[in-house]
Amino acid sequence: MTHPLHIAVLMGGWSSEREVSLTSGNGVADALESLGHKVTRIDMDRDVALRLAEAKPDVVFNALHGTPGEDGTVQGMMDLMGLTYTHSGLTTSVIAIDKELTKQQLVPHGIRMPEGIIVESESLHAGDPMPRPYVLKPVNEGSSVGVAIIKERDNHGVPIHRDSHGPWQTFATLLAEPFIRGRELTVAVLGNRALGVTELVPSSGFYDYEAKYTDGLTTHICPADVPADIAEAAMRMALDAHRLLGCKGTSRSDFRWDDERGEAGLYLLEVNTQPGMTPLSLVPEQARHVGLTYADLVQAIVDEALAGKAAR
């Protein structure tokens, strides 16, 4: 760092990931203050544009998760205001938050992703959209919010009962994908570098929202105990996805790996352009593995945002 900056940290908001965002944002703000920066913490509300205009920051650190901080809405607002901000821009955010648009962007370039179909939630009560087991997920939510695995003879019924609890009660449309057996892997990318591969072993068997953000519910194995060619393939796919989508700052790519099929069993599930920065989050964990402190990581994200401004 050459000189202290005034940095607004945007956090909170009203998405289903509000609490995670507040934890991420306050952690980021504490780190920036420890580095000597002036920090304005903004818990985003409907008056966010006014508050940013009043703050006049050198750069905005976007620590929001979910809508509207991850879907291009806030990015478009900050573009109109002429603000410099961290992480991905408008177009990338619009594409990456939508799992189907992400597939359309990445699969033609050889990145393996599960085939899926968009289904009307109402239709699920008449019959399954594909053979079980399969996964139902919202098209544009993160942190495994609203994800359900539909198994043979499970307690959702055959077909899914109308009164059975699941994402079909909340979302009008869902993405249905074949369930991929195997192991959960994730790769963080910082700038132009894939940091490593972590395996996630949730105690419940499914890496859902609670498992992600509750201490002790998921074991993180970093680096993952996988063959070198699988680790290299996952990091290559994550870096390719980061570049093809036009991600900035940091991203996190989530994978399923069927370890009975070798590299052919490695599937990219989604790319998160606003990955968590909480004490349990995966990007800070992988950064530590390669020798970066939490403060180093935060500063690197800010530096890339400023470098992007200078290049324009």
Curated annotation (Swiss-Prot):
Q: InterPro entries of this UniProt entry?
A: ATP-grasp, ATP_grasp_subdomain_1, D-Ala_lig_Van_CS, D_ala_D_ala, Dala_Dala_lig_C, Dala_Dala_lig_N, PreATP-grasp_dom_sf
List, in alphabetical order, the Gene Ontology terms for molecular function in this entry. ATP binding; D-alanine-D-alanine ligase activity; metal ion binding
Pfam families given in the database record: Dala_Dala_lig_C, Dala_Dala_lig_N
List GO terms (cellular component aspect).
cytoplasm
GO:BP terms for this protein? cell wall organization; peptidoglycan biosynthetic process; regulation of cell shape
Q: Which cofactor does it need?
A: Mg(2+); Mn(2+)
Q: Which amino acid positions bind ATP, per UniProt?
A: 130-186
Give a short account of what the protein does.
Answer: Cell wall formation.
Protein family (similarity comment): Belongs to the D-alanine--D-alanine ligase family.
* Family matches, as HAMAP family: Dala_Dala_lig
Under which name does UniProt file this protein?
D-alanine--D-alanine ligase
Organism listed in the record: Rhizorhabdus wittichii (strain DSM 6014 / CCUG 31198 / JCM 15750 / NBRC 105917 / EY 4224 / RW1)
Gene name as annotated = ddl
